């Protein structure tokens, strides 16, 4: 096993522990708590994959961080912080919408890259909007936290979420996953719209109804992917 993989996991475990202590003092805002909850799932998945105990990894991560801080001067720390662009967190869903459980009468699930797509194929003839919580950097989508499909009545009928055991995804991965979800929902004569905010940081263009305008090549690719699978 790569030593960098192990030490990265150890540091992530300790930093999560620090953030959890911060949240326990009721100091975290909604985006902070949302990331904390999702990072916990990711760490559990990584720990299982690597075969490492999270408590032991947290202690080792503490030693690594302490050693770095002892060697770091205040001036170097200021320069590092100033040189790293800070991502922005955009929330289209409330915590209730993100944490709400939902059921599928005819479930369909597909994994593409490190993203899991789930949808209810029993839904027909509905108007559906896709909303997401995600981070952006340099005015482009950096990381998807969670995307969900809602009917006009507020029911959840689809979802795209990162797999805890496979961290990391690209903007292109998110676009492809959205295309698969849209195609699957439209298969049953549903009308699907993408929220304006999500649209702005992915394709950066839309029609008057907020429908994503996929490039022709990508649209053909999505059609070939969707027809035999959904």
From Swiss-Prot:
Keywords: Eukaryotic host gene expression shutoff by virus, Host cytoplasm, Host gene expression shutoff by virus, Host mRNA suppression by virus, Host nucleus, Host-virus interaction, Inhibition of host innate immune response by virus, Inhibition of host interferon signaling pathway by virus, Inhibition of host PKR by virus, Inhibition of host pre-mRNA processing by virus, Inhibition of host RIG-I by virus, Inhibition of host RLR pathway by virus, Interferon antiviral system evasion, RNA-binding, Ubl conjugation, Viral immunoevasion. Residues 223-230 are annotated as: PABPN1-binding. Residues 1-73 are annotated as: RNA-binding and homodimerization. InterPro entries: NS1, NS1A, NS1A_effect_dom-like_sf, uS15_NS1_RNA-bd_sf. Its main location: host cell. A motif (Nuclear export signal) lies at residues 137-146. Pfam families: Flu_NS1. Transmembrane segments: none annotated. GO terms for biological process: symbiont-mediated suppression of host cytoplasmic pattern recognition receptor signaling pathway via inhibition of RIG-I activity; symbiont-mediated suppression of host gene expression; symbiont-mediated suppression of host mRNA processing; symbiont-mediated suppression of host PKR/eIFalpha signaling; symbiont-mediated suppression of host type I interferon-mediated signaling pathway. The dsRNA-binding region is required for suppression of RNA silencing. Inhibits post-transcriptional processing of cellular pre-mRNA, by binding and inhibiting two cellular proteins that are required for the 3'-end processing of cellular pre-mRNAs: the 30 kDa cleavage and polyadenylation specificity factor/CPSF4 and the poly(A)-binding protein 2/PABPN1. In turn, unprocessed 3' end pre-mRNAs accumulate in the host nucleus and are no longer exported to the cytoplasm. Cellular protein synthesis is thereby shut off very early after virus infection. Homodimer. Interacts with host TRIM25 (via coiled coil); this interaction specifically inhibits TRIM25 multimerization and TRIM25-mediated RIGI CARD ubiquitination. Interacts with human EIF2AK2/PKR, CPSF4, IVNS1ABP and PABPN1. HAMAP family: INFV_NS1. Belongs to the influenza A viruses NS1 family. This is Non-structural protein 1. The lineage of its organism: Viruses, Riboviria, Orthornavirae, Negarnaviricota, Polyploviricotina.
């Amino acid at each position: 096993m790569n030593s960098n993989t192990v030490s990265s996991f150890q540091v992530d475990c300790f930093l999560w522990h620090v953030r959890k202590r911060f949240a326990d003092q009721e100091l975290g805002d909604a985006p902070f708590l949302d990331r904390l909850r999702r990072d916990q799932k990711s760490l559990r998945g990584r720990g299982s994959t690597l075969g490492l105990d999270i408590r032991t990894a947290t202690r080792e991560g503490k030693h690594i961080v302490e050693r770095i801080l002892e060697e770091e001067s205040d001036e170097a720390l200021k320069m590092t912080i100033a040189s790293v662009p800070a991502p922005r967190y955009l929330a289209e869903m409330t915590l209730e919408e993100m944490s709400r459980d939902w059921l599928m009468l005819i479930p369909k699930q597909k994994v593409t890259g490190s993203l899991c797509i789930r949808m209810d194929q029993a839904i027909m003839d509905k108007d559906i909007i896709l909303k997401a919580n995600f981070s952006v950097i340099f005015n482009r989508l950096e990381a998807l936290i969670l995307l969900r499909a809602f009917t006009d009545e507020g029911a959840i009928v689809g979802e795209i979420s990162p797999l805890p055991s496979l961290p990391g995804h690209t903007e292109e991965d998110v676009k492809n996953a959205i295309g698969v979800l849209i195609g699957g929902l439209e298969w049953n004569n549903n009308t699907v719209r993408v929220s304006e905010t999500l649209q702005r940081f992915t394709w950066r263009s839309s029609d008057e109804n907020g429908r994503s305008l996929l490039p022709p090549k990508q649209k053909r690719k999505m059609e070939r992917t969707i027809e035999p699978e959904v």
